[in-house]
């Protein structure tokens, strides 16, 4: 889940849900840095989604300390609703939150790109024509990539929902998702792997 806006405050009642960590997000209020993710929607050439996802798993910085980590790479089902062929990649910018995002963004400039990637991007262009990125911040109740791994969360079908809400209501909306939808999903064996705005 993601809501695209920046919150002013997170209700204290929403800081502890569903057995996940309580984490006030505001660094200014003495909290820890927020987890930051990049949600990429990639336009795929023909039926190249499988080859592209395999290529993404070999992204050079994926195993470097302090760089992004691929949380998951998913293809959009043509029969499942939505635009296709596409692949959705979720990149975790690390424990440093916004600073981790800044550091990873810096490595993409033209002078540094060759040092990190070599021919990786040129090869990736065989399977993709472009895409759209969203920079998202995790909210209380959203597991980190490490927590997902520790809990052994895996699946063959992931539902990716993007909502647009009235400006200024994204925090309230996500608190309701944590309060109301997450428990209902859990009753049916469905686990939220990302709650981002």
Regions found by a protein language model. Name each.
Residues 38, 85-87, 131, 159:
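Residue-level detector of short, conserved catalytic/binding motifs and their immediate flanks
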Residues 1-24, 31, 50-74, 79-84, ...:
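An amphipathic, aromatic/His-enriched active-site/gating alpha helix that lines ligand/cofactor pockets
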Residues 23-24, 31-51, 139-197:
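Surface-exposed interaction/gating patches
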Residues 82-85, 143-145:
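Short, solvent-exposed polar/charged micro-motifs at secondary-structure junctions
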Residues 41-42, 91-93:
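Extracellular/lumenal glycan-associated surfaces
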Residues 75-76, 87, 148, 196:
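Short amphipathic alpha-helical patches
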